[in-house]
Amino acid sequence: MDIQLIQIENDEFESVFSVVKQGLYSHVDAVFGWCDEFQVNRLKNDYEPHWFHWVYINNEQVGLLCFKPYENAFHVHLLIVFPEFQNQQLGGRVMNVVHEMAREQGRSHVTLSSFTRNESALRFYKSLGYKVTESDENFLSLSLQVAS
C-alpha cells in the first residue's frame, strides 16, 4: 500500500474544516467548548495552508495530516484517519512517512501534543515510541527522536 501526502488546494478549506471538526469536536468541546467561528478563525490564522495534506493510500483519500517544520524537528498538529479506515494500522504508516521525511531532511525529532482525554491517540503515539515531555491538565506534549 502506497501512502501519498497531497498538499491541500486553496479552495479546500471547507473540506479541511469539516474533517478537523469531525476528528476533534468531542475533545475541543469537552475542554473549551466548540465554537465554529473561533475554530475557523484559528485554522485560518494560526496554521499555514501548506502544512495540511490529504492522506491517500492506493489513490483513496483516507485522512488528513497537518505538520510543520521548526528548528530541528517536525511538529504534527493533527493526524485524522477517517473512521472507516481506523484500526487498520494506517496511522502508524502515515507517522512512519513523517519520521522518514524528518530523517531525510536532517531533523532529529518529531513532536506533537494531544488532549489528555484522547486516550486512544495517546496509546497510539506511545506505541510508536513517543515520550511525554510536558503536561498540564488538558494536554500532553510528546516527542520522538528519529535521528541523532
Where are these regions (language model features)?
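Conserved active-site tyrosine of GNAT-family acetyltransferases
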Residues: 43, 125, 130
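Conserved beta-strand-loop-alpha-helix junction that forms the acyl-donor binding cleft
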Residues: 112-122, 138-143, 147
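Conserved GNAT acetyl-CoA-binding A-motif
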Residues: 102-114
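Conserved beta-strand in the GNAT
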Residues: 54, 60-68, 75-80
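Conserved GNAT-fold acetyl-CoA-binding loop/helix
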Residues: 21-44
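A conserved beta-turn-beta hairpin within the catalytic core of GNAT-like acetyltransferases
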Residues: 68-77, 86, 108, 136-139
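Conserved acetyl-CoA-binding loop-helix of GNAT-fold acetyltransferases
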Residues: 81, 87-100, 123, 127
